[in-house]
C-alpha cells in the first residue's frame, strides 16, 4: 500500500469546504484576554511573554517603530502557537502552506517599505545605490537592489515553509519506519523510536525558533525603514 507523504499538508475540508480559516483562528481563540480581576497562571505567563517579546524586538527601534510592538508580538505568538499545534498527531499545520506564509510576510514588509518611503524618502532611495559605486555599475546595482527588496517577503515565507515541512516529513518517515520495523526487528525499532523522540523534541525547538526568526526579520525590515 502506497502512502502519500504530503497528504498531511493538503488543506483539510469539511463537506467540500476548506476549513483552514477555522484552523487559523484557533490560536487567537485560546489566547483570549481574561476578564477576571486576578489573572490565572496562563494569562500571567501570556502577559509576561508579550512583555519579553516586546522588550527584545523593540530595543533597536525608534519611537515610531515601537508602535508596531503589538503587531510583532501577535505575529510571533500566532506563528509559534500554530507551529506547536501542528506537532500534535493528526493535525494540520497551516504554516506548511506557502500561500499562508506569504500572506503573513507581505503585509508587514509592504507596510515597512511604504513607511520608509513616506518618512525617509532619501534614505530609502539610498539603499538602491551604495555610496562609491562606479558609474558603469549603477544601472545593474539598482536592478539588483530592487530585486533583492522584492525577494524579502518571498524569502521569509519560503524559509518558514521549508523548515516546518522538512521537519514534518522527517517525523513522518521515521515514524513509518518504526512501525514497519516493529514486526521485523524490535531492537532496531527501539533505536528508530528513540530517534523519533529526539527529532520531536528538536521540532518543538524549531517551531519556536522559526517563529522568532520570522518576526525578527520583519522587525529588522521595519528598523531599516524607520
UniProtKB/Swiss-Prot annotation:
One Pfam family of this chain? ATP-synt_A
Q: Report the locations given in the UniProt record.
A: Mitochondrion inner membrane
A single GO cellular-component term from the record reads:
mitochondrial inner membrane
Q: Which domain of life is it from?
A: Eukaryota
What membrane topology does the UniProt entry give? Multi-pass membrane protein
Give a GO molecular function annotation for the protein.
proton channel activity
Q: Name one GO biological process term.
A: proton motive force-driven ATP synthesis
Q: Which reaction does it catalyse?
A: H(+)(in) = H(+)(out)
UniProt keyword list: ATP synthesis, CF(0), Hydrogen ion transport, Ion transport, Membrane, Mitochondrion, Mitochondrion inner membrane, Transmembrane, Transmembrane helix, Transport
In terms of CDD domains, this protein maps to:
ATP-synt_Fo_a_6
- Primary localization class, coarse: mitochondrion
Q: Which family does it belong to?
A: Belongs to the ATPase A chain family.
Describe the subunit structure: Component of the ATP synthase complex composed at least of ATP5F1A/subunit alpha, ATP5F1B/subunit beta, ATP5MC1/subunit c (homooctomer), MT-ATP6/subunit a, MT-ATP8/subunit 8, ATP5ME/subunit e, ATP5MF/subunit f, ATP5MG/subunit g, ATP5MK/subunit k, ATP5MJ/subunit j, ATP5F1C/subunit gamma, ATP5F1D/subunit delta, ATP5F1E/subunit epsilon, ATP5PF/subunit F6, ATP5PB/subunit b, ATP5PD/subunit d, ATP5PO/subunit OSCP.
The entry's function note states: Subunit a, of the mitochondrial membrane ATP synthase complex (F(1)F(0) ATP synthase or Complex V) that produces ATP from ADP in the presence of a proton gradient across the membrane which is generated by electron transport complexes of the respiratory chain. ATP synthase complex consist of a soluble F(1) head domain - the catalytic core - and a membrane F(1) domain - the membrane proton channel. These two domains are linked by a central stalk rotating inside the F(1) region and a stationary peripheral stalk.
Which NCBIfam families does UniProt cross-reference here?
Answer: ATP_synt_6_or_A (TIGR01131)
Q: What is this protein called?
A: ATP synthase F(0) complex subunit a
What gene makes this protein? Answer: MT-ATP6
Amino acid at each position: 500500500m502506497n502512502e502519500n507523504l504530503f497528504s498531511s499538508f493538503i488543506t483539510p475540508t469539511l463537506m467540500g469546504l476548506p476549513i483552514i480559516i477555522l484552523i487559523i483562528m484557533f490560536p487567537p481563540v485560546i489566547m483570549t484576554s481574561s476578564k477576571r480581576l486576578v489573572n490565572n497562571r496562563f494569562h500571567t505567563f501570556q502577559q509576561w511573554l508579550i512583555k519579553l517579546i516586546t522588550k527584545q524586538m523593540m530595543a533597536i527601534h525608534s519611537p515610531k517603530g515601537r508602535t508596531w510592538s503589538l503587531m510583532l508580538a501577535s505575529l510571533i505568538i500566532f506563528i509559534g502557537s500554530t507551529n506547536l499545534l501542528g506537532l500534535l498527531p493528526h493535525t494540520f499545520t497551516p504554516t506548511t502552506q506557502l500561500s499562508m506564509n506569504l500572506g503573513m510576510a507581505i503585509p508587514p514588509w509592504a507596510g515597512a517599505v511604504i513607511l520608509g518611503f513616506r518618512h525617509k524618502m532619501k534614505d530609502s532611495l539610498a539603499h538602491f545605490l551604495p555610496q562609491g559605486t562606479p558609474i558603469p555599475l549603477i544601472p545593474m546595482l539598482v536592478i539588483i537592489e530592487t530585486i533583492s527588496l522584492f525577494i524579502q517577503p518571498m524569502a521569509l515565507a519560503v524559509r518558514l515553509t521549508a523548515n516546518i515541512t522538512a521537519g514534518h516529513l522527517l517525523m513522518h518517515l521515521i515514524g513509518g519506519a518504526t512501525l514497519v520495523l516493529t514486526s521485523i526487528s524490535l531492537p532496531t525499532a527501539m533505536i528508530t523510536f528513540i530517534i523519533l523522540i529526539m527529532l520531536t523534541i528538536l521540532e518543538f525547538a524549531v517551531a519556536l525558533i522559526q517563529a522568532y526568526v520570522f518576526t525578527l526579520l520583519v522587525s529588522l525590515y521595519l528598523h531599516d525603514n524607520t
